[in-house]
């Protein structure tokens, strides 16, 4: 297929050459030669199976050129005849001459074309053979070149791989050395930092230790000072409460003795009056034994009732005073306990001492109150002989004495002091009120 196409191209080249030769002939003919216009036309080639051979194509091209030339000559003659009637003969003669010249030229062109076609054929064959040889040689060279390039590329690749391998090994060794160096530097840096942190920590620990010791000493001194203050204050309060309680107990004792003396004198006087009345009226009493007995009994009952009322009033007042004194004593005990607990919180070593002192003070207060109670009880208790006579008089009709019964109740510590204080307030004797318990402590604060 490629050879047929090449043949067609060569035929076209030959036709062009023939047309060029004809054009040259027309130019060299001079003024008398009629110019012929050769129109080149591309001929469509039939399908490959209907194509003629190379020679046939050449002859067909020559024949076409001849026909074109003839048509041109005939056309020119016809135009000349129509243009001017005068040059018709000349045009006919010229046309005949041109026709003969054209035929001759066509034959020459055919011979020349055949010769050229032969030359072109040989040239084409030579060129094809040469191209074939060149192609084979080029293919061989290309194969050799490719093989050389492949070998060269292989060698170059191997060389590059070796270079890369060496480069990688060098880089690995360099990285290893650099890593080891960095690790060593890091280890040294870490050791330095650890040592520095250790030194700094030791320094801080020493500072904190000294600071803690100083604070502990300050706290100890402060606690000891506060404990001493609390101890002194507790002792001072305990002494005040003790003195106040003793003073009140003494006052209560005196007042109680005075009151009991008055009651005793009143009872004795009443008894004397009754005895005098009974002795002076013996005769009358004998005559009016029953009346006298009833009167004496009534008088005794009245005296006993008065005495009971007085004692009941004193008992009620004593109960109130007892409650008030108990509240005061409890308040004093609570203050003592609070002071003791405060001293215990500030200084543990002084807790036991403060508690012991508080308990001693408390025991002293309650002991003093107990002694006062016993004294009052002993004063209020009637002698045993009077008790026996009174019992015998009740059983056998009388002993000639007027018996006054005094009911004595056992009271708790502090009741008497409270009762006496309430009695003083009822009778207007408020001049012995000492006022607030902590006034003296406030005035004397800082003297100890």
Curated annotation (Swiss-Prot):
Expressed in mature seeds. Induction: By abscisic acid (ABA) in immature siliques. Residues 420-432 have a biased composition (Polar residues). InterPro entries: ECP63-like_dom. The keyword Cell membrane does not apply. It holds the Pfam family LEA_4. May be involved in the BHLH109-mediated regulation of somatic embryogenesis. This is Late embryogenesis abundant protein ECP63.
């Amino acid at each position: 297929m490629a050879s047929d196409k090449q043949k067609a191209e060569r035929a076209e080249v030959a036709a062009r050459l023939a047309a060029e030769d004809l054009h040259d002939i027309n130019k060299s003919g001079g003024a008398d030669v009629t110019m012929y216009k050769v129109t080149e036309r591309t001929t469509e080639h039939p399908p490959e199976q209907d194509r003629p051979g190379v020679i046939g194509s050449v002859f067909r091209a020559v024949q076409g050129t001849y026909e074109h030339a003839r048509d041109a000559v005939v056309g020119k003659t016809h135009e000349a005849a129509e243009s001017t009637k005068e040059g018709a003969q000349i045009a006919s003669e010229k046309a005949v001459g041109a026709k003969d010249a054209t035929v001759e030229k066509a034959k020459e062109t055919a011979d020349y074309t055949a010769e050229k076609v032969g030359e072109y054929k040989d040239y084409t064959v030579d060129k094809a053979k040469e191209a074939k040889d060149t192609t084979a040689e080029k293919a061989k060279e290309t194969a050799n070149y490719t093989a050389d390039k492949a070998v060269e590329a292989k060698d170059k690749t191997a060389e590059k791989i070796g270079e890369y391998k060496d480069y990688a090994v060098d880089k690995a060794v360099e990285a290893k050395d650099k890593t080891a160096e960095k690790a060593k530097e890091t280890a040294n840096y870490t050791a330095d930092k650890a040592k520095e942190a250790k030194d700094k920590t030791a320094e801080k620990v020493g500072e904190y230790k000294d600071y803690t010791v100083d604070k502990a000493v300050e706290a100890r001194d402060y606690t000891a000072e506060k404990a001493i203050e609390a101890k002194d204050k507790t002792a001072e309060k305990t002494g005040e409460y003790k003195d106040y309680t003793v003073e009140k107990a003494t006052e209560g004792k005196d007042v109680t003795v005075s009151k009991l003396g008055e009651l005793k004198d009143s009872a004795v006087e009443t008894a004397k009056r009754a005895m005098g009345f009974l002795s002076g009226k013996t005769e009358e009493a004998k005559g009016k034994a029953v009346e006298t007995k009833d009167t004496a009994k009534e008088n005794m009952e009245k005296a006993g009732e008065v005495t009971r009322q007085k004692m009941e009033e004193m008992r009620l007042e004593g109960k109130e005073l007892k409650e008030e004194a108990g509240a005061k004593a409890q308040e004093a005990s609570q203050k003592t306990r609070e002071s003791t607990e405060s001293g215990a919180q500030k200084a543990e070593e002084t807790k036991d001492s403060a508690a012991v002192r508080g308990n001693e003070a408390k025991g002293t207060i309650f002991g003093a109150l107990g002694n006062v109670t016993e004294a009052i009880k002993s004063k209020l208790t009637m002698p045993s002989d009077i008790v026996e006579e009174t019992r015998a008089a009740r059983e056998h009709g009388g002993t000639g004495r007027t018996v006054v019964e005094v009911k004595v109740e056992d009271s708790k510590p502090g009741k008497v002091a409270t009762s006496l204080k309430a009695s003083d307030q009822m009778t207007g004797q408020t001049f012995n009120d000492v006022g607030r318990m902590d006034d003296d402590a406030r005035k004397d604060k800082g003297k100890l």
